[in-house]
From Swiss-Prot:
Disulfide bonds: none annotated. Pathway: Cofactor biosynthesis; NAD(+) biosynthesis; nicotinate D-ribonucleotide from quinolinate: step 1/1. Transmembrane segments: none annotated. It is an enzyme of class 2 (transferase). It catalyses: nicotinate beta-D-ribonucleotide + CO2 + diphosphate = quinolinate + 5-phospho-alpha-D-ribose 1-diphosphate + 2 H(+). GO terms for biological process: NAD biosynthetic process; quinolinate catabolic process. Keywords: Glycosyltransferase, Pyridine nucleotide biosynthesis, Transferase. The keyword Transcription regulation does not apply. This is Nicotinate-nucleotide pyrophosphorylase [carboxylating]. One of its GO terms (cellular component) is plasma membrane. Pfam families: QRPTase_C, QRPTase_N. The lineage of its organism: Bacteria, Bacillati, Actinomycetota, Actinomycetes, Mycobacteriales. One of its GO terms (molecular function) is nicotinate-nucleotide diphosphorylase (carboxylating) activity. Homodimer. Hexamer formed by 3 homodimers. It comes from Mycobacterium tuberculosis (strain ATCC 25618 / H37Rv).
Amino acid sequence: MGLSDWELAAARAAIARGLDEDLRYGPDVTTLATVPASATTTASLVTREAGVVAGLDVALLTLNEVLGTNGYRVLDRVEDGARVPPGEALMTLEAQTRGLLTAERTMLNLVGHLSGIATATAAWVDAVRGTKAKIRDTRKTLPGLRALQKYAVRTGGGVNHRLGLGDAALIKDNHVAAAGSVVDALRAVRNAAPDLPCEVEVDSLEQLDAVLPEKPELILLDNFAVWQTQTAVQRRDSRAPTVMLESSGGLSLQTAATYAETGVDYLAVGALTHSVRVLDIGLDM
């Protein structure tokens, strides 16, 4: 898929932090003691479980940082987005052994985390297949890793929500409390940022009824039951069909299809980035 400039910068920063954590107290003493300086090896990144791969370019950037571009050679690799079975070699390379072992943990931490996100996203995408609903991430990301986490969501077949606070407006309950009402908040945002897409969170059908005539780009249905979501879709379709609807809160893989079948446009899944399990990947020499 390839990393954007923003994602490349985020990857380099994450790699620098990871290597600093490993090396700030001194060099890799175990490797220096056990591996001759001239040693080279052939090694593979191997997944211990089925999943969707993401972050192999980040692995290469890690090797670049430790070994330089001439310190290793890639013999074979799969592409990000590939669905792989347990035991699959994701990438095989020849490398200077000391540098490879020094880079190993930073490389595996990032690839395992990003592949875990891609794998989880793909499971959600599979759960809603056959409906029009798309799986979308949130800003519930780990500090410093948002760009890479959102890349991994796309790699798994999901779509990205806003990247920050300035590329779209999202009116939530605290904004409503400050403005006085949900409609007042929406009008204030449109007056302040008329060129930005505006989304509004509602927590009741009454709030939905108040917002629909204003026709924001999207209405987020916060913790709606399935029957409420069905009603919201019916009202949207009859009153403001251009407005998109997103279900958020209380969703699970088990209920994803039920919500998607109501006709909403998106399911917002914060767990894709804030609490995902890593994909178990190891380095085999």
